[in-house]
UniProtKB/Swiss-Prot annotation:
Higher taxonomy: Bacteria, Bacillati, Mycoplasmatota, Mycoplasmoidales, Mycoplasmoidaceae
Top-level taxon of the source organism: Bacteria
Transmembrane segments: 27-47, 64-84, 244-264, 289-309, 387-407
One Pfam family named in its UniProt record: CbiQ
Subcellular location: Cell membrane
Protein family membership: Belongs to the CbiQ family.
Primary location recorded for the protein, binned into one broad class: membrane
Disulfide-bonded cysteines: none
Topology of this chain in the membrane: Multi-pass membrane protein
UniProt keyword annotations, A-Z: Cell membrane, Membrane, Transmembrane, Transmembrane helix
Gene source species: Mycoplasma pneumoniae (strain ATCC 29342 / M129 / Subtype 1) (Mycoplasmoides pneumoniae)
Cellular component terms (Gene Ontology): plasma membrane
Database matches in InterPro entries: ABC/ECF_trnsptr_transmembrane
Stated name of the protein: Uncharacterized protein MG181 homolog
Length: 434
């Protein structure tokens, strides 16, 4: 049964095996935290590459890695199916050079716009570090598979809230017609919107057609907000690149967890795991918590899982040789067949637990007494270096994530996952009335 779950301790002479057990546990926990934090596609991919490199540096069998990938392939398909029908919005990105937010003004005959920069990402602390500039943004579609440039869709533009905008501008006497104050003609405002050049990059999709734009005009006493949004004519079967990436994004999280857990359990013996957990939970001793009991329980549980799964495979083979069919039949037939597996497994689990308890008792194990260790674990410069580098990486990634750094110039689909670009566009489209 070549599954990652049955990977026991694999003795090898590598620096990963020689790391202090507490160091390995701390590094594992830091990366687990990073996996659960929404750090984005790029940073998560870096962790995935790191986990893969560590796996092979530890000289673990390649079949463990392949079985890990096979085990979550079904999960990826399930997530893809769910995202297919729940994420039909491909996301969008409006370029700075081609689109401007506007303040309406009247030049005597026509209603025009003052040009105001739509998309200014220089507010980001890391704009210079990652070279966020307009020139690169306008060329984004040429270097990035994730975008496609739409045709001009001004003929399909919808404008909502235009009546309230006209009423507000007229009531404040903001504009003059031929030297005199008059009411604002909403048709001129509408015409100015429709004449305004709008271009947008959409995430790629299959089965949906781009229909145009919606300009939503929100009016208050002090501000008038113009929000430009694309809208699509999508069918129930539209598949967006965003759905594929989101499915892969979540699946990658689980795969990273599997690889890291495999490295931890395959490079640490039961004694090392118990020692590392006990040292890691040492502060709880101040609260009179039996840390050594918890540590031994966790270590034994980790080691019991592989043995139980091996036993389950043996039972399946034995029952199949007796003519029991676990593969054919409807759902209820298969459930009844599984009873012949569950009952022996429970019996074996209790038997193994009893044998282990007797063996520990015969060796004089007493959880209430202080225990010594045969092997002395010491933290050397390798452990310190590995822990410091991991901690620095952890701090940098969290800091960049909090600041909202993304990698548009690298052609990544970061904006599909975080939505930060979309939020920034909508914020930039909010302008005060003249």
């Amino acid at each position: 049964m070549d599954s990652f779950f049955i990977n026991g301790y694999v003795p090898r002479d590598t620096f990963i095996h020689r790391l202090h057990p507490t160091t390995k546990l701390l590094i594992f926990l830091l990366f687990v935290i990073l996996v659960f934090v929404p750090i984005g596609f790029v940073f998560q991919s870096v962790i995935f590459v790191f986990a893969t490199v560590i796996f092979f540096v530890a000289k673990l069998p390649g079949r463990f890695y392949l079985s890990s990938i096979k085990s979550i392939s079904l999960l990826f398909l399930l997530l893809l199916f769910v995202n297919w029908f729940t994420f039909r919005d491909p996301g969008f990105y409006i370029t700075a050079d081609q689109v401007n937010t506007v303040k309406p003004h009247f030049n005597g005959n026509n209603f025009n716009f003052w040009n105001i920069s739509l998309f200014n990402y220089q507010d980001n602390v890391f704009s210079q570090v990652f070279n966020f500039n307009r020139a690169n943004m306008t060329e984004l579609n040429k270097i990035n598979f994730f975008f496609k440039e739409t045709a001009n869709a001004n003929a399909y533009t919808k404008v909502t809230g235009i009546d309230k905008l006209a009423e507000m501008l007229a009531s404040k006497n903001l504009f003059k017609f031929n030297g005199s104050t008059n009411g604002i003609d909403k048709n001129k405002i509408l015409g100015a919107f429709l004449d305004h050049k709008i271009a947008v990059y959409l995430g790629r999709s299959w089965g949906g057609d781009f229909s145009g734009f919606v300009i939503d005009v929100s009016v208050s006493d002090k501000t008038s907000t113009f929000t430009i949004k694309p809208f699509l004519a999508n069918s129930n079967y539209v598949l967006t690149l965003r759905a594929i990436i989101l499915a892969f994004y979540v699946t990658q999280k689980i795969l990273i967890m599997i690889i890291l857990a495999t490295v931890l359990t395959s490079t640490s013996s039961s004694v090392e795991l118990a020692y590392g957990i006990e040292r890691l939970l040492w502060p709880l001793k101040l609260l009179r918590v039996p840390v050594n009991v918890f540590a031994m329980t966790i270590a034994i549980a980790i080691r019991f899982v592989p043995s139980l799964l091996l036993e389950s495979q043996r039972i399946l083979n034995a029952q199949a040789s007796r003519g029991l069919d676990f593969k054919n039949g409807n759902f209820f037939v298969k459930m009844r067949s599984l009873s012949s597996l569950v009952v022996p497994m429970i019996s074996i689990a209790f038997r193994n637990a009893g044998e282990l308890a007797s063996a520990m008792e015969a060796r004089g194990y007493d959880p209430t007494k202080k225990r010594t260790t045969y092997r002395k674990f010491k933290i050397d410069w390798v452990d310190a270096t590995a822990l410091i580098l991991t901690a620095l990486y952890f701090v940098v990634i969290i800091f960049l994530t909090v600041k909202g750094a993304v990698f548009l110039d690298l052609g990544t689909p970061e904006w599909l996952l975080t939505g930060k670009i979309k939020e920034q566009v909508e914020r930039s489209l909010s302008v005060k009335s003249a």
